[in-house]
């Protein structure tokens, strides 16, 4: 799983939800703590009035999973559908990070966190659009991406 540095995923325009990664010394994921309304501050970041380490690694749901995981996912979905959907058929959500967290908790899966210092270009707020467009324009100008990115498809 790609572990983004929190400060590289925050919006200048308001709070965001991020899955803060807890890991052992070998960067094996032990838990993802969903943290809501993380906002930039002069000192770094905070959520619900508590400081949050801006150098924490966070999950942006960029998982690298093996084909065998699809079988496990399907089995988990059947259980989810039987238990969760009847009580809340319109809003029940099968969230992969929560499912993976349960597998980690029961020792049925391991996930290596691979740190990336890249920036996450998210559009949580309408006001984020201009900054994202500007960032992609600069990447095109700097040759990070070619202008005709999809021409060979």
Pin down the residues of each PLM region.
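Residues that scaffold the ATP/ADP-binding catalytic core of kinase and kinase-like folds
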Residues: 32, 72-73, 132
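Hydrophobic helical membrane-anchoring modules
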Residues: 107-110, 118-153
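Hydrophobic alpha-helical scaffolding
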Residues: 63, 86-90, 122
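A C-terminal functional module that forms or caps the active site or interfaces directly
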Residues: 74-109
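Glycine-rich loop/turn
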Residues: 45-51, 101-116
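Alpha-helix/helix-capping structural signal
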Residues: 67-68, 127
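Conserved core of the sugar-phosphate nucleotidyltransferase
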Residues: 1-63, 67
